[in-house]
């Protein structure tokens, strides 16, 4: 089973999965947690993590994926957070910086990726990369 928590991708990743016939047998949920408040309330991201590292960080991505996996006891979970632009965030992290966290039966990995392009392109590239991460988990474990 698969669960997804999206910030910068804003539902695009879930939409890409739902485009595929038969996904209903695997996809449990996809939620968009764009604000810090929703990351805390829906996913259990710690306020201290957001204050110390910011919403766009490896630590936040890790807590997001842990939270979404725990909600419905998913086998596979993915979380995305990043800066789609057009401006960098208040801490100066660059446009295109993306963290994609994956969870598989308790194992968590976080990939830091930088994409070039406009807001639309960065969001699409991040979604495609997250799909690729799901694909790699499935191939490795089947």
Regions found by a protein language model. Give the residues of each.
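Short alpha-helical segments enriched in small residues
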Residues: 1-142
């Amino acid at each position: 089973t698969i669960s997804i928590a999206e910030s910068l991708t804003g539902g695009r990743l879930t939409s890409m999965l739902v485009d595929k016939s038969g996904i209903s047998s695997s996809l449990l949920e996809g939620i968009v947690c764009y604000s810090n408040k929703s990351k805390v309330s829906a996913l259990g991201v710690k306020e201290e993590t957001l204050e110390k590292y910011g919403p766009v960080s490896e630590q936040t991505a890790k807590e997001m994926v842990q939270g979404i996996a725990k909600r419905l006891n998913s086998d596979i979970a993915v979380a995305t957070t990043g800066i789609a632009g057009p401006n960098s965030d208040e801490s100066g992290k660059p446009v295109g910086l993306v963290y994609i966290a994956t969870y598989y039966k308790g194992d968590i990995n976080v990939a830091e990726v930088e994409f070039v392009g406009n807001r639309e392109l960065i969001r699409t590239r991040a979604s495609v990369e997250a799909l690729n991460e799901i694909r790699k988990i499935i191939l490795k474990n089947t």
